[in-house]
């Protein structure tokens, strides 16, 4: 009781915190004891999470590096195993493949040219020049590939060439479309006289060539093509001129043959007869 009286003049018991020697400091986040423990726990948890994240990142980085190393190793092994594939073994094979590529390109270009002419994207004059050149190149290509390409239709099938217009122009007919249908619009007297003289000269030159036995395909074919073109320039003949049909048939026949082939005696005699008959009809038409 004396103890109580020494600390409390009113004889009341001392408060429960009177025996605390060093009270905890207050904190704006809450009660002192709870706050400190929570803060410490949070700090510990954060440290643990950070350590876990760092460990995960390190593991991911290590996995990525291992994966990259594995890919690089496989790539190096793959490059080491690659072998050069040659399309040809010698110069002869190389030339053959180049000639095949040229034939392929000629057919494709002719197909595009025919479609452009149908759409009126190219003038008749330019079409005739380009088409005649392609036909000549086609004949030369056939000569170079006579042992490899015996059938152009089969060649187009093997290489998936769906070029019907080119096949008709190069293989079946062998002359530009402008030679089938007259596209020349010149009608003056001077131009008419020039066209007549040119046609007469070509008739005579072609017939003389046959009489001299110069009957190889690469020799007769250009003469007949020039004659056909010259007759088309003479509009006054009309589309039913008999001589034009006969010459067109002969051009188609020659187009089926190789450039190095020659007409036999029967073919030469028949061609000469048809030309002579066509020339006589043409000459009579001039006088009439």
Swiss-Prot record:
<dbReference type="InterPro" id="IPR007143">
    <property type="entry name" value="Vps28"/>
</dbReference>
<dbReference type="GO" id="GO:0006605">
    <property type="term" value="P:protein targeting"/>
</dbReference>
<dbReference type="GO" id="GO:0044877">
    <property type="term" value="F:protein-containing complex binding"/>
</dbReference>
<dbReference type="GO" id="GO:0000813">
    <property type="term" value="C:ESCRT I complex"/>
</dbReference>
<keyword id="KW-0813">Transport</keyword>
<dbReference type="InterPro" id="IPR037202">
    <property type="entry name" value="ESCRT_assembly_dom"/>
</dbReference>
<feature type="region of interest" description="Disordered">
    <location>
        <begin position="1"/>
        <end position="65"/>
    </location>
</feature>
<dbReference type="InterPro" id="IPR017899">
    <property type="entry name" value="VPS28_C"/>
</dbReference>
<dbReference type="GO" id="GO:0043328">
    <property type="term" value="P:protein transport to vacuole involved in ubiquitin-dependent protein catabolic process via the multivesicular body sorting pathway"/>
</dbReference>
<dbReference type="Pfam" id="PF03997">
    <property type="entry name" value="VPS28"/>
</dbReference>
<keyword id="KW-0653">Protein transport</keyword>
<keyword id="KW-0967">Endosome</keyword>
<comment type="function">
    <text>Component of the ESCRT-I complex, a regulator of vesicular trafficking process.</text>
</comment>
<dbReference type="GO" id="GO:0031902">
    <property type="term" value="C:late endosome membrane"/>
</dbReference>
<dbReference type="InterPro" id="IPR037206">
    <property type="entry name" value="VPS28_C_sf"/>
</dbReference>
<protein>
    <recommendedName>
        <fullName>Vacuolar protein sorting-associated protein 28</fullName>
    </recommendedName>
</protein>
<feature type="domain" description="VPS28 C-terminal">
    <location>
        <begin position="191"/>
        <end position="287"/>
    </location>
</feature>
<feature type="compositionally biased region" description="Low complexity">
    <location>
        <begin position="18"/>
        <end position="64"/>
    </location>
</feature>
<keyword id="KW-0963">Cytoplasm</keyword>
<feature type="domain" description="VPS28 N-terminal">
    <location>
        <begin position="74"/>
        <end position="181"/>
    </location>
</feature>
<comment type="subunit">
    <text>Component of the ESCRT-I complex (endosomal sorting complex required for transport I).</text>
</comment>
<comment type="similarity">
    <text>Belongs to the VPS28 family.</text>
</comment>
<keyword id="KW-0472">Membrane</keyword>
<feature type="compositionally biased region" description="Polar residues">
    <location>
        <begin position="1"/>
        <end position="10"/>
    </location>
</feature>
<dbReference type="InterPro" id="IPR038358">
    <property type="entry name" value="VPS28_N_sf"/>
</dbReference>
<dbReference type="InterPro" id="IPR017898">
    <property type="entry name" value="VPS28_N"/>
</dbReference>
């Amino acid at each position: 009781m004396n103890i109580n009286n020494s600390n409390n003049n009113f004889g009341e018991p001392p408060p429960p915190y009177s025996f605390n020697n060093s009270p905890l400091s207050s904190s704006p986040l809450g009660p002192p004891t709870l706050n400190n423990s929570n803060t410490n726990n949070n700090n510990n948890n954060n440290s643990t999470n950070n350590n876990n994240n760092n460990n995960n990142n390190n593991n991911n980085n290590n996995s990525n590096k291992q994966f990259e190393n594995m890919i690089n190793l496989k790539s190096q092994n793959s490059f080491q195993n690659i072998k050069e594939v040659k399309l040809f073994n010698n110069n002869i094979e190389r030339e053959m493949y180049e000639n095949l590529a040229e034939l392929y390109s000629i057919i494709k270009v002719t197909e595009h040219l025919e479609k452009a002419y149908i759409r009126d994207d190219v003038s008749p004059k330019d079409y005739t020049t380009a088409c005649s050149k392609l036909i000549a190149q086609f004949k030369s290509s056939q000569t170079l590939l006579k042992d490899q390409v015996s059938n152009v239709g089969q060649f187009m099938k093997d290489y998936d060439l769906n070029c019907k217009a080119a096949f008709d122009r190069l293989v079946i007919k062998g002359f530009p479309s402008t030679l089938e249908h007259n596209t020349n619009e010149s009608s003056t007297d001077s131009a008419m006289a020039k066209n007549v003289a040119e046609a007469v000269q070509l008739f005579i030159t072609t017939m003389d060539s046959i009489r001299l036995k110069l009957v190889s395909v690469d020799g007769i074919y250009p003469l007949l093509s020039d004659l056909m073109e010259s007759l088309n320039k003479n509009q006054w003949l009309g589309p039913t001129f008999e001589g034009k049909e006969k010459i067109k048939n002969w051009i188609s026949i020659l187009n089926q043959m190789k450039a190095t082939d020659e007409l036999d005696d029967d073919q030469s005699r028949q061609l000469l007869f048809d030309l002579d008959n066509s020339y006589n009809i043409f000459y009579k038409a001039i006088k009439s």
